[in-house]
Amino acid sequence: MRSFANIHAGETCTIIGNGPSLKNVPLAFLHKYQTFGTNRIYLLDGFEPNFYVSVNPLVIEQCQHEINDLHCVKFITSSMAHLIYGSYPIISNGAPRFCYEPFIELYEGFTVTFAAMQIAYFLGFTTVLLVGVDHRFNFEGDPNTRQFMDHDDNNHFSPEYFKDKFWHTPDLERSNEAYKMAEDAFRADNRIIINLTRNSGTDIFERQDLKSWL
């Protein structure tokens, strides 16, 4: 993974969240810049990202065949990387901080989006655009608990996303804490993360209208 250091220095990329608002993002925009997709992004018809990131063992274990069908560069948590052919393992049990060298350690930050931000920084991107980062979920029970979803998934862009699968309920407060680490790290290096997600539930990053980037 060291060979990826700064290969996209000075460039713009898009990190794609999997919220319902992603359905309103034109595919043409997703093909405009280098892209990071996560978890079940492959359910989005007509699209495959340049880089794929997954750090959740539940997702990887249940969806390994679909992930293996992707032809992009894949960064996978090291404990599950043996299931994904040709993937680059990342040590995703790092201390709670923004990690600048994800081939050594990476902090998950309770959201795979934060993992993607650390990798994007390592690859040298100076502008990161966010779409589909709705940061809103409907669920019962406590955050960060394992549950089985026996109905359509209304928290993601596809009703099939976690339908009939196990998932971990989100911890939005801790995710925001991680986002603040990313915001501070990018700003300190004259880089920027811009949230283009309409009605996003997180206010950590600068907000802009997606239309201005089309």
Where would I find each of the regions flagged by the language model?
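Metal-ion/cofactor- or nucleotide/acyl-coenzyme-handling active-site neighborhoods
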Residues: 1-214
